[in-house]
Amino acid sequence: MIYAQILAGGKGTRMGNVPMPKQFLLLADKPILIHTIEKFTLESRFDAILVVCPADWVSHTEDIIKKYITDERVHVVVGGADRNETLMSGINYIQDHYGIQDDDVVVTHDAVRPFITQRIINDNIVAVLENKAVDTVVPAIDTIVRGANDQVTDIPVRSEMYQGQTPQSFHIKILIDSYNALSSEQKASLSDSCKICSLAGQKVSLVRGENYNFKITTPFDLRVASALVEKRS
């Protein structure tokens, strides 16, 4: 089976003084999260679409989905304390409600990347069915500088650098085995789901993203996103 998992567990602290997590803020006439869910409901190959959100916001999430979304494949799941616990909460839901077969895959995506295209979703599905793990990236435009203690320690070759986006897609059993193989210290250091597999020695394939598949994190991002929606309408 092919699952989608929309990670909506963030608190949105970098958005500033706002009354709710950023995924629930309005973008034009509806919440950011709804824009994202709609993109995934267009893909008929998904057997289920999980929206994983903070426990305190489950009722709100269910209410807005009921208002805007009619697709019965969409289910709300309680997330965890951080990104990767939220990811694994979705995996546990799949295990409990559907069982997990050897060829089951999951396409995971940030709730606050509402401009994902059907091409990116399709490329993730095709790639993850052929590979064990897939990351969506765009080539780095600016030079990447590594530093410590206010000093430059390395300047990697830019042509080898990419900026990570989502979706990040996985064979579910490989993801579970990779996560369980990590130490507590490794799990605590995770800032990216694909790192679960790379730390466990699994190869991660690349899918080309798009510059406008950006993450709405700050007030500036929200203004840019609002301008894009207005232009498209």
Swiss-Prot record:
Single annotated GO MF: D-ribitol-5-phosphate cytidylyltransferase activity
Top-level EC class: transferase
PROSITE patterns reported in the protein's UniProt record: ISPD
Pathway the protein acts in: Cell wall biogenesis; poly(ribitol phosphate) teichoic acid biosynthesis
EC annotation from Swiss-Prot or TrEMBL: 2.7.7.40
Signal peptide: none
PANTHER family: 2-C-METHYL-D-ERYTHRITOL 4-PHOSPHATE CYTIDYLYLTRANSFERASE, CHLOROPLASTIC, RIBITOL-5-PHOSPHATE CYTIDYLYLTRANSFERASE
Protein name per UniProt: Ribitol-5-phosphate cytidylyltransferase
